């Protein structure tokens, strides 16, 4: 089990608090001027394909010394061992946390309740391989004998965000199949998707562990009704629907052949489930071999995370730097900024991964914490973000640490597009770190022909303070393997922070109350009668909704 250690009571936390008093005056210009080897000292390579540069952070050797001491005092190493060994570290739900077993490519036994889960994991992978080979190869036929052309994945949360993010990121590896993702219970999402597909050549994947998720099953029934308008015979459902679920009874009642039901387990959290059968849409989009490459990449990062000393451990370093800003500098958010259009959903994916995991105000003993936990995660691809929100990052009053991610090799080397993209990638972190002084601004204005009065008037608005921290993550190329590396790296960063903050990162009770109340409100919307069973605001909104509909 995970230890219950209040981080604020550790010697390291107290040392960091004292260190912060002097560290507030850290200046990145000075830090780089004082140490010509700073980049070499504060960067790390993962294999031959990924470079993580964390030198443009407001840290020095003393900062890192105290942060690593914090990791040791909160017994991070034993927590890592507990997760990988199958202990039930998701204590509020009594579950192990073993998404890492799904990508365990060594087949080393992984025990849960005395049973090795690897034979079951590998059996599902083999079933996925057989299924994807048949669909991609055209052997799987629809009810009129035509091959499948379109896949519609119906899920929500982890059953949607992960597969969608990955299939978009790996679009250069796509085969002939067209992928569609439906998640929102708003009827617009399913209706607009169904307009694009042909019932004779469409395969629906219904991704719901329990086969009871409201949004997913509402969309699934709408899809089935639409399909049967053309197919007619209920028996044809089996040729056009597959299930990613564990509820065989409900799957069968829906009309899906349980031979086309792909299992996963309660030790797989939704936001970590793309490695499981939930990733079937990924395998269909890019082929099973590329899906395995994705697993291999994640497994490589798992091995690094488990076996590397904390001081050289990339997810640990990133997590600790995040804690430094979150808990000592008072930063409330972090931006993830991929300079790769294919990765346009990467920030959204880890918005869920981080905020659902570490958005907790109660510690592992059930007490309200007295310190900050999970940050707000957001971001968009570069260079779009530069023309949207970078203004605030550069010259606003909020401290926003940023991760910049970019591939050295583009999948689309059109003209000089990639050089221009990368020039912006390099320029932004340099500008954020070192800024532009008032002296430089005035010199530029004078050279531009401005008189003294004009210079004095405009100069303050053109000054960049700098000292805005960033990590730069340079990848040789975005491939299934390197994408697997990156996803696992961020997963483990989130885990490390949760361990140190003494919270449970693998439950998500915060999503339950809204669902519970929605289930109570739903029958109240069935007719035009006035509602007075809630607070005045909710009553007023419901009654106004009914009036608008009348």
UniProtKB/Swiss-Prot annotation:
E.C. designation(s): 5.3.1.9
Single biological process term from Gene Ontology: glycolytic process
One GO MF term attached to the UniProt entry: carbohydrate derivative binding
Subcellular location: Cytoplasm
Catalytically driven reaction(s): alpha-D-glucose 6-phosphate = beta-D-fructose 6-phosphate
InterPro entries to which the protein is assigned, alphabetical: G6P_Isomerase, G6P_Isomerase_C, Phosphoglucose_isomerase_CS, SIS_dom_sf, SIS_PGI_1, SIS_PGI_2
Intrachain S-S bonds: none
CDD domains from the UniProt entry: SIS_PGI_1 (cd05015), SIS_PGI_2 (cd05016)
Function: Catalyzes the reversible isomerization of glucose-6-phosphate to fructose-6-phosphate.
HAMAP family for this protein: G6P_isomerase
This protein's name: Glucose-6-phosphate isomerase
């Amino acid at each position: 089990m995970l230890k219950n250690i209040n981080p604020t009571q550790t010697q390291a936390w107290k040392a960091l608090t004292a260190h912060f008093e002097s560290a507030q005056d850290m200046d990145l210009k000075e830090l780089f001027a004082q140490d010509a080897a700073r980049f070499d000292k504060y960067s790390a390579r993962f294999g031959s394909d990924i470079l993580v540069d964390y030198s443009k952070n407001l840290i020095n050797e003393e900062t890192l010394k105290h942060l690593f001491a914090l990791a040791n005092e909160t017994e991070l190493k034993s927590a890592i061992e507990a997760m990988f060994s199958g202990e039930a570290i998701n204590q509020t739900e009594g579950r192990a946390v073993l998404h890492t077993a799904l990508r365990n490519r060594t087949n080393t036994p992984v025990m849960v309740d005395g049973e090795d889960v690897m034979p079951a994991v590998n059996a599902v992978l083999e079933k996925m391989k057989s299924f994807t080979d048949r669909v991609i190869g055209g052997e799987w036929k629809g009810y009129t004998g035509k091959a499948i052309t379109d896949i519609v994945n119906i899920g929500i949360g982890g059953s949607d965000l992960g597969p969608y993010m990955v299939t978009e990121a790996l679009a250069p590896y796509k085969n002939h199949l067209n992928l569609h993702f439906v998640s929102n219970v708003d009827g617009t999402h399913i209706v607009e998707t169904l307009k694009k597909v042909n019932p004779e050549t469409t395969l629906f994947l219904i991704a719901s562990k329990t086969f009871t998720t409201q949004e997913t099953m509402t969309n699934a029934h709408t899809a089935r009704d639409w399909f049967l308008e053309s197919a007619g015979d209920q028996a044809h459902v089996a040729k056009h629907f597959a299930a990613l679920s564990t509820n065989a009874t409900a799957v069968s009642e829906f009309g899906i052949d349980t031979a086309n039901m792909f299992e996963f387990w309660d030790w797989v959290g939704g936001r970590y489930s793309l490695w499981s059968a939930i990733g079937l849409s990924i395998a269909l989009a890019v082929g099973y071999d590329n899906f395995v490459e994705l697993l291999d990449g994640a497994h490589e990062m798992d091995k690094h995370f488990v076996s590397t000393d904390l001081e050289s451990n990339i997810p640990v370093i990133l997590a600790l730097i995040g804690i430094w800003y979150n808990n000592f500098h008072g930063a409330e958010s972090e931006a993830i900024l991929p300079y790769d259009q294919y990765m346009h959903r990467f920030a959204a994916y880890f918005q869920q991964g981080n905020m659902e995991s570490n958005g907790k105000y109660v510690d592992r003993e059930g007490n309200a914490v007295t310190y900050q936990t999970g940050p707000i995660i957001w971001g968009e691809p570069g260079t779009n973000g530069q023309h949207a929100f970078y203004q605030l990052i550069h010259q606003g009053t909020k401290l926003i640490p940023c991760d910049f991610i970019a591939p050295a090799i583009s999948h689309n080397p059109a003209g000089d597009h990639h050089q221009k993209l990368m020039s912006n990638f390099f320029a932004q972190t340099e500008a954020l770190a070192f800024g532009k002084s008032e002296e430089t601004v005035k010199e530029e204005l004078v050279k531009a022909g401005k008189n003294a009065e004009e210079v004095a008037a405009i100069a303050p608005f053109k000054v960049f303070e700098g000292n805005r921290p960033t990590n730069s993550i340079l990848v040789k190329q975005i491939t299934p393997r390197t994408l697997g590396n990156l996803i696992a790296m961020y997963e483990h960063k989130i885990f490390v922070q949760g361990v140190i903050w003494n919270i449970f990162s693998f439950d998500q009770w915060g999503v339950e109350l809204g669902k519970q109340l929605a289930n109570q409100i739903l029958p109240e919307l069935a007719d035009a009668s006035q509602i007075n069973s809630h607070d005045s605001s909710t009553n007023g909104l419901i009654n106004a909704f009914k009036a608008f509909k009348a």
